[in-house]
Amino acid sequence: MKDNVAHRITGAVKLFTGLLAASLLNGQIATAKPLVHDAEYYVLEKQNGETWALEDKDLDKRLAEFRKKNGGRSPNIFYILIDDIGFGDLGDETLNAIRGYKTPNINEFAREGMRLARMYTEPSCTPTRVAFMTGRHPVRNGMGNTAVDISGFGLAEGEVTIAEILSEKGYNTSHVGKWHMGDIREAWPNMQGFDYAAFPIHQQGQLTIYHDDAADEEISIGIGKNNYDDRYTMDEWLRTDASSMVTGVEGVRGENVREVYMDAGERWTEAKYHEMNERYQSQAMEQLRKLAKSNKPFFLQYWPLYPLTGPRTTTDQYTTPNGGVYVEKMKLVDKWIGELMTEMDELGIADNTLVVIMGDNGHFTKYSPGSGYTPMVFRGGKGSTLEGGVRVDAFVRWPGMIEADSVAGDIIHVSDLFTTIARLGDATDEIPTDRIIDGIDQTSLLLNGDTYSRRDYVFLYNINNLEAVVKEQYKLDLASGKENAILAKFYDLFRDTREEWPVSTEVGAWGGAKFVRMVQRHMGRKAKYPDAPPATGMPYAGIDNLRPETQAAVQEFLYMMKTPGM
């Protein structure tokens, strides 16, 4: 009897050892380290963890069923991020009518999927893109600021992006359009997990505001080839010259890139900017067709430069009642998105593709009202942590998995897409566990709908400064209490969408201490997981065909960075 038991125990031990070894080889150990989140997540997990665990079992079953029907493959991911579009500008015919223009294709897309009514982003371009790509608040990796010129810094290669994570699970990856995460080699998309990338090194400041056409229309003053009197000019390096900076480049994973469609001595113009936008639309379409032919799932990222524009040089004259230059270009972007959605239908991939369309931050109010956009539901715009700066339209579609024509009123942050997409791509085990991941897995929200979010809070940074905290419908404006915390203002965002009527006594009396502790817990995590600076390096190193004027611009930058006092 003892021999029998001993034999069974020995066999069990061998079986367990074999299973453990297999698990080690596959990197799928049941006791793998969990993700590290911010402190507030654990407050919610303590109270809701058992419910979430039950939900996860059902979600895993549904995702497994999808993969089985899809030939064992995870869904394709198509992410479209539109620049400087505030809340209420897309996806709704009534609000379109108020604005005096139409976005019929995005409106139809919104009806086919879920509207994320409380999508929060960062206040400007670069930080929102970093938050999506890394699942982390940009303050954690030094990428909270937005560079508009040659800068010599960018996203560090040590950051793990959603493209890298999905690549590990067999996804083909492509990026087309705006990037804006640095002008150094390690920061570029083809060095951050994308197999193919076509993108401008910089952003629309260079591409549509700094050039001669913009100076001719006085969108910019004091620059341009023939737009100022230079009799008193001593510092020839003072003025940014769009034509001397690198414009658009193309490349493949791990290799140098090449600047395209810009010859030595050529001036950058609004017409060339328009051609760049048309080219990116064509390349997005080409990549969609190419990726759809593969037997692997794909992650396609398309970040248009339009609707941002400056001069009316390439803008049809008032084809909408609104007539603003951004609005006229948004009409074009809507047309282009419609073409991409139609192509997905024709390729037969719509049902196995998760598509997200959203804005990156609020309106660029500096150019209001000529742009055609002004804040509507919320107050504030780009560069602000008022709701108008960080609340955007966001729509997500996955036929058969996400309920059509639905609305989620839960809080969600752009960083949550990182963690959620990783799970949908069966790649959660590729997310690093040696750093804080701010993004929360929101698969339950997408597949179960309204009230299933796993987040009821968001921390709002402006560059490196924590300026506001949102919890449920209440917002603490930390900026208003810089001199004295007692003076910090509370707002009820349901009753006061424009943050004009503080309820500091009514909410602060019971919630003030709770919010202070939230901030203390958040800051306390930084002792173990401190914020890091961005990567630095030689601007444009890794571009094989730098023009002579670009090489001179780099030398000017390097000299100014090493002058006394720097």
Question: Residue locations for each model-derived region?
Answer:
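Long, internal low-complexity/basic segments
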Residues: A30-P75, I82, F87, R115, ...
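Core domains of carbohydrate- and sulfate-ester-processing enzymes
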Residues: P34-T51, A117, P127-V130, N190-M262, ...
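Active-site segment of extracytoplasmic enzymes that catalyze sulfate/phosphate-ester chemistry
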Residues: L35, N48-A53, F87-S174, I184, ...
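A long, amphipathic alpha-helix that forms part
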Residues: D38-Y41, T51, E275-A292, T315-T353, ...
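A short beta-strand-to-alpha-helix junction
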Residues: G72, N96-T103, Y120-S124, D149-V160, ...
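Metal-dependent active-site segment of extracytoplasmic phospho-/sulfohydrolases and closely related
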Residues: N105, P297, W303, L332-G370
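C-terminal cap/loop subdomain of S1 sulfatases and analogous C-terminal strand-loop tails that border
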Residues: Y196-Q206, H363-E387, I402-S406, D410, ...
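Active-site His/acidic residue clusters
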Residues: D212, D263-A264, S282-K329, F364-K366, ...
